[in-house]
């Protein structure tokens, strides 16, 4: 309980934040269209968030930085932000404070990063190839990832690293280089133990989905289904003293199985390692795991830029 709790206050804060960021977005677009003489034809704001705007300065670079090195272009953009954009934003905030009858302006926006490439997959899902961070020039570009599977704990660790490597290739190399990388990783992936490629999850609602006759009920989440199958098989094999049952709230891993396996189920979960007594290693569905853990997350990115993860045969190539 909080003395000053009031939904109206929360709503007012949220609405004010949305209004402020949209106000700055409109003002920045207006300013850049005027300076670059695009007469309101271009939207220079790629995206905005609660307290951030992402500004595309490609037209400015094209007009003023022909023949310049990447280092010189970055220096130029930094100077533009410091001497033009930030003072303009400060002026706009003062105007907004006056408009809203604020006691004084308390809003400030500073440049965070300069990136030479960026890809937006969806709202709040993007990646930036950062070359300058808060005025500090980076010796090597640094990936800033938001909402991408490479930073999600639900993705296997090995795939998180490889997704980051693939994004680096997308940011700096050619599509054919990505094809080679994916093909090589697929070979490596099929040699990895099941524990390395399984999905990590937290297991909840075991009692809700358990069925004494059929192990699990229809509609059971796949990782819970795998956990119930695991507990059933531990009991069937008499392994209770060697392997603990999966309990409510346990951190587990689950992995897909090919259909032709002794358990007749398409998934199995476990706590730390797959019991050798189950003799399921040869039935691990590496193809599906590769699709779900690596290719599916990559497809969102590749669709946004029109790339493929492997070479596509064309009619021209077929007929030589």
Locations of the language-model features?
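DNA-dependent DNA polymerase catalytic subunits
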Residues: 6, 14-48, 57-320
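Active-site cores of enzymes that catalyze phosphoryl transfer or operate on phosphate-rich substrates
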Residues: 1-3
């Amino acid at each position: 309980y909080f003395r000053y709790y009031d939904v109206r206050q929360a709503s007012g804060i949220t609405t004010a934040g949305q209004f402020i960021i949209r106000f700055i977005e409109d003002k920045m677009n207006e300013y850049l269209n005027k300076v670059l003489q695009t007469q309101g034809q271009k939207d220079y704001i790629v995206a905005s968030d609660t307290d951030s705007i992402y500004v595309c300065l490609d037209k400015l670079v094209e007009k003023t930085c022909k023949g310049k090195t990447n280092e010189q272009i970055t220096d130029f953009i930094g100077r533009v932000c410091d001497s033009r954009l930030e003072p303009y934003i400060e002026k706009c905030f003062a105007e907004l404070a006056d408009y809203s009858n604020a006691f004084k302006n308390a809003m400030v926006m500073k440049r965070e990063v300069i990136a030479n490439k960026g890809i937006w997959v969806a709202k709040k899902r993007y990646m930036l190839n950062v070359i300058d961070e808060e005025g500090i020039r980076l010796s090597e570009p640094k990936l800033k990832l938001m909402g991408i599977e490479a930073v999600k704990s639900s993705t296997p660790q090995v795939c998180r690293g490889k997704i980051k490597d693939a994004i680096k290739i997308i940011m700096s190399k050619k599509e054919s280089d990505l094809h080679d990388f994916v093909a090589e990783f697929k070979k490596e992936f099929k040699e990895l133990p099941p524990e390395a490629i399984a999905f990590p999850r937290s297991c909840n609602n075991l009692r809700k989905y358990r069925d004494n006759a059929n192990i699990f009920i229809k509609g059971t989440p796949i990782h819970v289904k795998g956990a119930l199958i695991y507990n059933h098989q531990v009991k069937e094999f008499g392994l209770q003293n060697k392997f603990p049952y999966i309990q409510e709230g346990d951190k587990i891993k689950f992995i897909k199985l090919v259909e032709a396996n002794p358990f007749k189920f398409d998934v199995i979960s476990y706590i730390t390692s797959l019991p050798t007594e189950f003799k399921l290693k040869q039935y691990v569905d590496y193809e599906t795991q590769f699709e779900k853990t690596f290719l599916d997350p990559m497809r969102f990115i590749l669709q946004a830029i029109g790339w493929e993860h492997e070479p596509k045969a064309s009619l021209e190539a077929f007929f030589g």
